[in-house]
């Protein structure tokens, strides 16, 4: 029978109280390392801002030549509902240029930098082979930044944008993303002024019945279509319902 290792012998000789403390220390260290690894995975420490998800099949005739730009929420494009929403659009035949908002806004951006990110993403999508027009989709924090950027979209790009889809946008803007918004701090400005100025294309605004700080109920312009889903800001985490609603908006053309 093999003899116990030095570490095993030492643990056996350690009083139970100290042994428990040592085990708890190891468990705490494992939790910290796990949390750091998770934050790295979702993109808080850096990584690609853009990810292209090709269409999984041929697009329906009406959507041919159209790509989607998708801005994730503040938990990034690799977790939560975002990956399901992105893949659902691609599975229906539309390529998606996904933006990891957590990575893009991990450091506070100026309003002008936020605007330029939306412009750059639009141009990137339009430069993809075969793409002639784009649909712009934002989720939560991504919806906030999207509407702010679209409000001042250059005139040269406007004719090539089919519509804007805002999923659970808030009534305030913060130009910095932290996981789940826990470290965001106070809002930088109200969301309504920029959102109200988007009067040149169709806008679909999706919100939950129990949301308390939603932008959607504040929008009454003729070009805005509001859609209400069950739940609060997280919509009961029902990615299938939200992805179906987004695709219905895409098929409607606004």
Task: State where each predicted segment sits.
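Alpha/beta-hydrolase active-site loop
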Residues: 107-129, 135-136, 144-148
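A conserved short beta-strand
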Residues: 156-172
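Short, surface-exposed "cap/lid" segments of acyl-processing enzymes
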Residues: 45-94, 98-102
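N-terminal Lys/Arg-rich, disordered targeting/topogenic segments
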Residues: 1-20
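Hydrophobic membrane-insertion alpha-helices, especially the h-region
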Residues: 21-39
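The feature captures the conserved acid-bearing segment of alpha/beta-hydrolase catalytic domains
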Residues: 168-169, 173-227, 231
């Amino acid at each position: 029978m093999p003899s116990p290792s030095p570490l095993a012998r030492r643990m056996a000789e350690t009083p139970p109280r100290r042994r428990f403390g040592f085990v708890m220390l190891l468990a705490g260290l494992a939790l910290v390392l796990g949390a750091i690894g998770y934050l790295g995975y979702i993109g808080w420490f850096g990584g690609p801002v853009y990810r292209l998800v090709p269409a999984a099949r041929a697009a329906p005739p009406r959507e041919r030549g159209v790509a989607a730009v998708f801005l994730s929420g503040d938990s990034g494009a690799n977790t939560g509902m975002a990956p399901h929403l992105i893949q659902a659009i691609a599975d229906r035949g539309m390529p998606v240029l996904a933006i990891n908002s957590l990575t893009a806004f991990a450091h506070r951006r100026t309003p002008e930098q936020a605007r330029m990110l939306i412009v750059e993403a639009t141009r990137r999508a339009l430069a993809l082979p075969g793409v002639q027009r784009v649909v712009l989709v934002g989720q939560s924090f991504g919806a906030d930044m999207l509407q702010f950027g679209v409000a001042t979209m250059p005139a040269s790009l406007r004719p090539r944008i089919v519509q804007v889809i805002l999923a659970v946008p808030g009534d305030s803007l913060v130009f910095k993303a932290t996981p789940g918004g826990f470290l965001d701090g106070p809002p930088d400005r109200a969301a309504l002024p920029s959102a109200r100025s988007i009067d040149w294309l169709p806008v679909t605004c999706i919100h939950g019945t129990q949301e308390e700080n939603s932008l959607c109920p504040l929008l009454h312009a003729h070009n805005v279509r509001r859609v209400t889903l069950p739940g609060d800001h997280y919509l009961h985490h029902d990615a299938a319902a939200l992805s179906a609603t987004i695709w219905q908006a895409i098929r409607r053309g606004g």
